[in-house]
Amino acid sequence: GRRMKNVAKDFEKSRDFLICIDSDGCAMDTMDVKHMRCFAPCLVHEWDLGEYRDDIVRLWRKINLLSRSRGINRFKGLAKILVEINENYTRVDGLDELIYWVQTTDELSEESLREAYERTGCNCMKKALEWSRLVNDSIVMISNSRKSPFEGVEEALKLIKGKADVVIVTASNGQEIRREWEDSGLMEYADLLLSQESGTKEMCLRSLTEHGYEKDHVLMIGDAPADKMAAESAEALFYPVLAYQETESWEEFAEEGLKRFLEGTFAGTYQEEKIKEFYANLDL
């Protein structure tokens, strides 16, 4: 959409290489705490699902942490679980309209959802908005000590500094991610932050690659299949951070991945090997 172009034109290429980094569950150890203490409980509350609480929390965790859809945008995750709730637990009013919005909007953000709600008056959209705001408020309430980077991240960022441009690319709320990077002193290592307000990860990566980097000079670091797909669609390389082996992944990137990326030996066997480990780790 119109906004994306703005975001990209603010960015200036200053090095020959570009590294894009996802935040939640990749650079930041925030995935479990946000999903188990914020997203899932707020869902149970907003749709009054107390009697199915354990099932719903388990289902939310499976969709958003332990499957192919790990790390997807919150509204996509919400639509997915509401479909299951509607089929197996209790009727969800207005679900079709919410699903239609999720599938067709060019921006999966609160602002875009609010515009759609004002247009349609759909009850499910209203609840989705209230849920999302509740989630934001509850994330703010989590203490900073529970929202810190994985071990190995800062060391890797120090090694990258000066060698590649660095952009945080997240499907989360931009304000929240900026605050987390600032609080942990990592924002100084990043040149730009692109979030759900900027557009999809694919759009963000594509617009960044249009800044004149050579082939195989752009790398996405992520922990979810969605990150890999975004990298592929922008013809970028992909380095996976393995769920529950994050520190090891970052240490290996610092020791080997980065060097290969800068020397041009990342594509091919090394990347294929990493992606194989990535899929095996998520049981895909």
PLM regions and their residue ranges:
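Short, Lys/Arg-enriched N-terminal segments with co-localized hydrophobic residues
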Residues: 1-3
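Short amphipathic alpha-helical segments and helix-helix/interface helices
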Residues: 154-158, 205, 228
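Short, basic/aromatic recognition patches
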Residues: 5-10
